[in-house]
Amino acid sequence: MARDKIALIGSGQIGGTLAHLIGLKELGDVVMFDIAEGVPQGKALDIAQSSPVDGFDAHYTGANSYEALDNAKVCIVTAGVPRKPGMSRDDLLSINLKVMEQVGAGIKKYAPDAFVICITNPLDAMVWALQKASGLPHKKVVGMAGVLDSARFRYFLADEFNVSVEDVTAFVLGGHGDTMVPLVKYSTVAGIPLPDLVKMGWTSQARLDEIVDRTRNGGAEIVNLLKTGSAFYAPAASAIAMAESYLRDKKRVLPSAAYLNGEYGVKDMYVGVPVVIGSKGVERVVEIELAGKDREAFDKSVGAVQGLVDACKKIAPDLLGR
């Protein structure tokens, strides 16, 4: 049986890590695309040469033409300018919006049936623009944000409680930025809600607040440490979890930047919420009850995303007609 074709649009740090993980998990054959000549070809060859050692048979190719995306089953988009120290995700807006228009046109022409995962920042606005530019169904275009933000939250909690990350569940909703909403109420350790763990004396509310704040600034913390780029291992692993759920119809519930058309009181926007990802794409939006401070924080986050989308509309008004 022929292996699925997975196209990686952007061959930087995340793209290279994605390509290697796809081989290790044997999810399919890989096409690495980039506008920089030689870069995708070199990385594809390097990773392919690791296959005899790691024991996988995926086929790797590098390309500088969108034609290479032809009939890809999954497209993962990392193309764009990465964050640098002192730079917010929003600073990237005008530059990466142009990139999304080009990428969307390429996907529309060569991979119109693909499941598309966007990683490019500012995420929520870029996935909105990518869907507009590609014209693909909303359920087939999604943004990778919540899986990563939730993974950071889970890691910090596991470290705080000195337990396995496997026993920690956590959800982060809203936009992928400073206004994201880590939900303490719906986060657990071995099924025990975090508020109960505070009552049990495992931690304090003040400490939980610190962890929530660190989660919100998780990306910036790594940018400031690296000084020359942004995170790539955890973002790549997060996107692979989404791609695997689609390719293998696992129907995992994953927090993702998904299109909302009335859910959570939001219309015509991509915002981070829990969704079921299966072979049809985003098969269901999981609408959990938000109240009090959580609702206020979510609405504030939606407002921030709306501001970015409005900015996109001003910069590229032609997207609205698509």
UniProtKB/Swiss-Prot annotation:
* Record-annotated active site: 176
The stretch of residues making up the signal peptide is none
Positions with a binding annotation for substrate: 83, 89, 121, 152
One BP term from GO: carboxylic acid metabolic process
* Keywords, comma-separated and alphabetical: NAD, Oxidoreductase, Tricarboxylic acid cycle
Q: Which domain of life is it from?
A: Bacteria
GO molecular function, one example?
Answer: L-malate dehydrogenase (NAD+) activity
Known catalysed reaction(s)? (S)-malate + NAD(+) = oxaloacetate + NADH + H(+)
Q: What class of enzyme is it?
A: oxidoreductase
Record EC number? 1.1.1.37
Its GO CC terms are: cytoplasm
Q: Does the keyword Protein transport apply?
A: no
Q: Where does NAD(+) bind?
A: 10-15, 34, 96, 119-121
One Pfam entry for this protein is Ldh_1_N
Q: What does this protein do?
A: Catalyzes the reversible oxidation of malate to oxaloacetate.
Per the record, the similarity remark reads: Belongs to the LDH/MDH superfamily. MDH type 3 family.
Q: Which NCBIfam families match?
A: MalateDH_bact (TIGR01763), PRK06223.1 (NF004863)
**Can you name this protein?**
Malate dehydrogenase
Output the lineage of the source organism: Bacteria, Pseudomonadati, Pseudomonadota, Alphaproteobacteria, Hyphomicrobiales
What gene is it encoded by?
Answer: mdh
